[in-house]
Amino acid sequence: MSTGTFVVSQPLNYRGGARVEPADASGTEKAFEPATGRVIATFTCSGEKEVNLAVQNAKAAFKIWSQKSGMERCRILLEAARIIREREGEIATMECINNGKSIFEARLDINISWQCLEYYAGLAASMAGEHIQLPGGSFGYTRREPLGVCVGIGAWNYPFQITSWKSAPALACGNAMVFKPSPFTPVSALLLAEIYTEAGVPPGLFNVVQGGAATGQFLCQHPDVAKVSFTGSVPTGMKIMEMSAKGIKPVTLELGGKSPLIIFSDCDMNNAVKGALMANFLTQGQVCCNGTRVFVQKEILDKFTEEVVKQTQRIKIGDPLLEDTRMGPLINRPHLERVLGFVKVAKEQGAKVLCGGDIYVPEDPKLKDGYYMRPCVLTNCRDDMTCVKEEIFGPVMSILSFDTEAEVLERANDTTFGLAAGVFTRDIQRAHRVVAELQAGTCFINNYNVSPVELPFGGYKKSGFGRENGRVTIEYYSQLKTVCVEMGDVESAF
């Protein structure tokens, strides 16, 4: 399949083990191919009736799935992981077409996805409570039990990967899930739904409903939904938390960020430059944990900046399905204009554009209406500038200088966000000292934007709470039951 040829021809809702048209509507949406600007799908947003049908299907499947042993769930999740590996090329291609990221990156995303399923398959077979001995031969024990029907609401920057990150631990714990993708990227969640069905989950265990805010509201407020996990913006996360609170539903929120990346003068310069590029330009800069505030110690500021600009200008922009492309288009026209607007404001506030920050028009005529821009490096930045304070969510790096460790820590933490942070230094004592002081849920030392599924991922402050990945996520998709067993006579006060 090549860029500019794909059109959705099947229903984009998934319920009861099959693709279906929604039973009712709450509006329509269009999905675009960012590389060309073509409409690839016009679809109906799910209304309250469709959401209820999806939840009821999930509720019925939950009764079957939750009674399976951990080993049975393990085998099915491992089979799903195997199918993802087998279909890696097809899924990665769909991700490129609907999201715009390069095929190089998309393959990495799909690999992380099947690794996530394998990881939680292993945990499914080893979940256990504990036994506590009490006086007189009595004892207590705990049971880790599933929650029920969980809701996943995904973002558009990692469509398939986020679907996997939310569904794998949920299903491993014995839950069912109704998933709502972003209306910008409705396609790839359906592929995972079909894979789960092929692997052997009960029909209805994993359902997909398409839609926007109204559909999300129906999900969050549904009385039979036990938990909501959301990835997206802070304002939307606040609304989801408020809606879920009315039903006393636990939530996991993975929200925005404005993360600091601290480059000390004793760093390995080559690795620090590569780390800064990884921290700013993956997925066209549309990554919530990106280290977009790059603090560089003054002694190496000029050398570091020169090398970063040189490497940024070499990034190959173009057709995301070509093997040598390293940066594709942004997600859509309004977002492209928003990011360009941030660059304009940065210049007005005194920042200097060292490269990029403007529209890029590929030579291939079929890409002329795509949403491309050149990756941007800003210098002469101050902490009070809009480009330094607000999440841009595009390929825009802001370089700031600093003198001392104490100074940069204070400035790095001066934000309402706390999703991620990074430090490059050869001084291992300094590295651990600095990350201990950084107010961020995920910290990197001498690397950035790596995401092993074995490690928990999540934020501090307004970047959200709860975690995805790692063993701890089991706690967010299960509940603990305590059982107290008396082996003697009841000692009564009456």
UniProtKB/Swiss-Prot annotation:
NCBIfam families linked: PRK13252.1 (NF009725)
Enzymatic reactions: 4-(trimethylamino)butanal + NAD(+) + H2O = 4-(trimethylamino)butanoate + NADH + 2 H(+); an aldehyde + NAD(+) + H2O = a carboxylate + NADH + 2 H(+); 4-aminobutanal + NAD(+) + H2O = 4-aminobutanoate + NADH + 2 H(+); formaldehyde + NAD(+) + H2O = formate + NADH + 2 H(+)
Protein's UniProt keywords contain Oxidoreductase: yes
Spans through the membrane: none
Family: Belongs to the aldehyde dehydrogenase family.
Keyword Chaperone: no
EC number of the protein: 1.2.1.47, 1.2.1.3, 1.2.1.46, 1.2.1.19
Any one GO MF annotation of this record: aminobutyraldehyde dehydrogenase (NAD+) activity
Residues with PTM N-acetylserine: 2
Modification N6-succinyllysine, positions: 30, 59, 303
UniProt-listed Pfam families: Aldedh
Domain of life per record: Eukaryota
EC top class, as a word: oxidoreductase
N6-acetyllysine: modified positions: 30, 298, 303, 344
GO cellular component labels: cytoplasm; cytosol
InterPro entries registered for this protein in UniProt: Ald_DH/histidinol_DH, Ald_DH_C, Ald_DH_CS_CYS, Ald_DH_CS_GLU, Ald_DH_N, Aldehyde_DH_dom
Gene name, Swiss-Prot/TrEMBL: ALDH9A1
GO biological process, alphabetically ordered: aldehyde metabolic process; carnitine biosynthetic process; protein homotetramerization
Location relative to the cell: Cytoplasm, Cytosol; Cytoplasm
Protein name: 4-trimethylaminobutyraldehyde dehydrogenase
Subunit structure: Homotetramer.
Entries under SUPFAM superfamilies matching the protein: ALDH-like (SSF53720)
